[in-house]
């Protein structure tokens, strides 16, 4: 036996000659097999190189393949370094050729990209211009709207100032009040009345006349010689002196909104029916004063359909009778002889006490149940007065007041009766 190094491992036997021959044959076979192996390796490397070249340059012409015999002889003569030399040489030349079109493509792409970039700024400029123009338009619209709104506000304030100036009445007086006139055409009437008052009274001792449209409309307002009212009818009045004129200012009462209107009178002033047949009511007064309205729950039990107005300083047109002032206390009379001015001596008051400055009247009933009752008069409308009895707080006409005095007395439902003259501020 021999190993790879040619060492003889066989035993020393008699067949030594045969072993020597075999060794020589084996050496020859080993040399030929190594040459064959090298030739086949060279063929394979040449094929790999050719395939690589064909892959890099598919259009290049492939060289004629030599026969296998020549390849084997060439490969046997070529040293083993040719394979590496070919690999180092071929890729460099072919890589240079293959990279050229790639650089061309990159340059073309860059040029196209630059063209696109040059195209976009123009579009961007157009878009910016459009946005700027739209912003300018919006700003102009806003400024126009603001000018319009300020103009309307200025117009409205000017109108309000004109209305306020038109509502202010002329005249020099010690008492001034706000004047609210509805509709605006009534301002002419007020101006005319102011001029007439100045010419008639000379501006001495007169008070300013004011009109006021309340939520609950006052049915009438009387001024001497000049009847001013929001109703289609007028009241006949007379004037015999300079100081008999009075003004009326009605104010709503916030405590009781369903009580009738109460007019204040002086202690010697009582309303009386006009005997001339005109149907109007004339009130006689001596001096102005401030009267108040009873706003108690007991006074609300009557008819209670007229709104309440609290008197600040209220007087109607008055007539001064002939004679001295001492006769004023006895010069008044009602058509109903049973009703007399003043109050009964036994009338009791609750709440804050009596109000002697109210227009009190009293009457004595007839019959078995007749008694003396007292009440406060007030003007119900232009042609009628009513009386609020102190015993029950009922609103009734003079005839009903007389009949009420003749009826049997029934205690009021609440303990707060007989407080018709009490006022709550």
Curated annotation (Swiss-Prot):
Q: Name one GO biological process term.
A: negative regulation of DNA-templated transcription
Primary location recorded for the protein, binned into one broad class: nucleus
Q: Where is the signal peptide?
A: none
Task: Alphabetically list the UniProt keywords.
Answer: Jasmonic acid signaling pathway, Nucleus, Plant defense, Repressor, Transcription, Transcription regulation
Q: Which signals induce this protein?
A: By jasmonate.
Result when mutating residue 11 to A: Loss of interaction with TOPLESS, but no effect on the interaction with TIFY10A/JAZ1
Q: Where in the cell is it found?
A: Nucleus
Region of interest called Necessary and sufficient for the interaction with TOPLESS, as start-end residue ranges on this chain: 7-17
Top-rank taxon, per record:
Eukaryota
Region spans: Necessary and sufficient for the interaction with the JAZ proteins:
322-425
Location of region: Disordered:
1-207, 288-327
InterPro entries annotated for this entry?
A: Ninja_fam, TDBD
Q: What are the Polar residues biased-composition ranges?
A: 146-158, 185-197, 288-299
Q: State how changing residue 13 to A affects the protein, per the record.
A: Loss of interaction with TOPLESS, but no effect on the interaction with TIFY10A/JAZ1
* Composition bias, Low complexity: 20-34, 66-81
Share what the entry says about its subunit structure, partners included: Component of a complex at least composed of TOPLESS, TPR2, TPR3, TIFY4B/PPD2, MYC3/ATR2 and TIFY3B/JAZ12. Interacts (via C-terminus) with TIFY10A/JAZ1; TIFY10B/JAZ2; TIFY6B/JAZ3; TIFY6A/JAZ4; TIFY11A/JAZ5; TIFY11B/JAZ6; TIFY7/JAZ9; TIFY9/JAZ10; TIFY3A/JAZ11; TIFY3B/JAZ12; TIFY4A/PPD1; TIFY4B/PPD2 and TIFY8 (via TIFY domain). Interacts with TOPLESS. Interacts with PAT1H1.
Spell out the note in the miscellaneous section. Answer: Unlike the JAZ proteins, the stability of AFPH2/NINJA is unaffected by jasmonate.
Q: Of which family is this protein a member?
A: Belongs to the Ninja family.
What protein name does the entry list? AFP homolog 2
């Amino acid at each position: 036996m021999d190993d790879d190094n040619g060492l003889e491992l066989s035993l020393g036997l008699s067949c030594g000659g045969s072993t020597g021959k075999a060794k020589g044959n084996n050496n020859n076979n080993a040399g030929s097999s190594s040459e064959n192996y090298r030739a086949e390796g060279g063929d394979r490397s040449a094929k790999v190189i050719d395939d690589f070249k064909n892959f890099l340059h598919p259009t290049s012409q492939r060289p004629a393949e030599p026969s296998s015999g020549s390849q084997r002889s060439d490969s046997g003569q070529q040293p083993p370094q040719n394979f590496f030399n070919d690999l180092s040489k071929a890729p460099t030349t072919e890589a240079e050729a293959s990279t050229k079109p790639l650089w061309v493509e990159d340059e073309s792409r860059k040029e196209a990209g630059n063209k696109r970039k040059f195209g976009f700024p123009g579009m961007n400029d157009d878009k910016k211009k459009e946005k700027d123009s739209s912003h300018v338009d919006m700003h102009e619209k806003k400024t126009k709207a603001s000018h319009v709104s300020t103009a309307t506000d200025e117009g409205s304030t000017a109108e309000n100032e004109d209305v306020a100036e038109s509502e202010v009445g002329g005249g020099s007086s010690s008492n001034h009040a706000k004047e609210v006139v509805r509709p605006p055409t009534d301002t002419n009437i007020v101006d005319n009345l102011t001029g007439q008052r100045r010419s008639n009274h000379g501006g001495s001792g007169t008070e300013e006349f004011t009109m006021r449209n309340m939520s609950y409309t006052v049915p009438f307002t009387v001024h001497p010689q000049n009847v001013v009212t929001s109703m289609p009818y007028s009241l006949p009045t007379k004037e015999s002196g300079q100081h008999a004129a009075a003004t009326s200012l009605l104010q709503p009462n916030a405590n009781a909104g369903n009580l009738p209107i109460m007019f204040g009178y002086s202690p010697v002033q009582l309303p009386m029916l006009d005997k001339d047949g005109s149907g109007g009511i004339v009130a006689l007064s001596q001096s102005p004063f401030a009267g108040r309205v009873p706003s108690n729950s007991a006074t609300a039990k009557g008819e209670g359909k007229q709104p309440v107005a609290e008197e600040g300083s209220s007087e109607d047109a008055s007539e001064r009778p002939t004679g001295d002032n001492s006769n004023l206390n006895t010069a008044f009379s009602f058509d109903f002889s049973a009703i007399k001015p003043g109050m009964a001596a036994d009338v009791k008051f609750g709440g804050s006490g009596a109000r002697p400055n109210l227009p009190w009247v009293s009457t004595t009933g007839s019959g078995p149940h007749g008694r003396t009752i007292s009440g406060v008069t007030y003007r119900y409308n232009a042609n009628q007065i009513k009386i609020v009895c102190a015993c029950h707080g009922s609103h009734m006409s003079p005839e009903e007041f007389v009949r009420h005095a003749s009826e049997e007395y029934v205690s009021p439902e609440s303990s707060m009766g007989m407080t018709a003259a009490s006022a709550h501020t």
